[in-house]
Amino acid sequence: MQVPTKATWPRPYVPRLSARLNYLVHHLLTPNRVNRMVARWLERHRRAGQAFTAAEKAVKERAFGCRMCGQCALPATGYACPQTCPKQLRNGPCGGVSPDGACEVFPEMRCVWVVAYERAEASGHLDDLSLLQRPIDHRLAGSSSWVNYWQGRDEGLWADPDDVRTRLPIWPTTTRSAA
């Protein structure tokens, strides 16, 4: 495993498009019968799936600084990608955020979670920031988060912290054999 240096760390990123517009697009792309059929087709046709994933990466990288984690948290973070946080924190800021909202690692940049708060508040989705996110499944890195979303691989990605009965699944729902 390559040890990240300051040059290779993720850098906080301010998205280019309004959160309100992104919530609208996300609503249009929610899982439905057609999207699931498209996802299944993309998974069966390797080259088409690779082209779709490359297009998704190009768009989301420019728009959000996307790191292609395969488990997109954008709808729960005001469309500010938590993977652009140098510490890749998915459930809120670290303790090093300065009073003016600067990132601890890159002080010349705004903390991605400050940006997420401002964007969620401006678009009326502040409650989304209280959703707890399960740890990222690194096996999905580089895969299409849209295909994963349409195929239901993101189910249980977020949980309401007030529901103490909610258990965040870390492992896939398929049974694992005992070691």
Residue locations for each model-derived region?
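Metallocofactor- and cofactor-centric catalytic cores in central/energy metabolism, strongly enriched
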Residues: 2-3, 10-14, 23-26, 33-34, ...
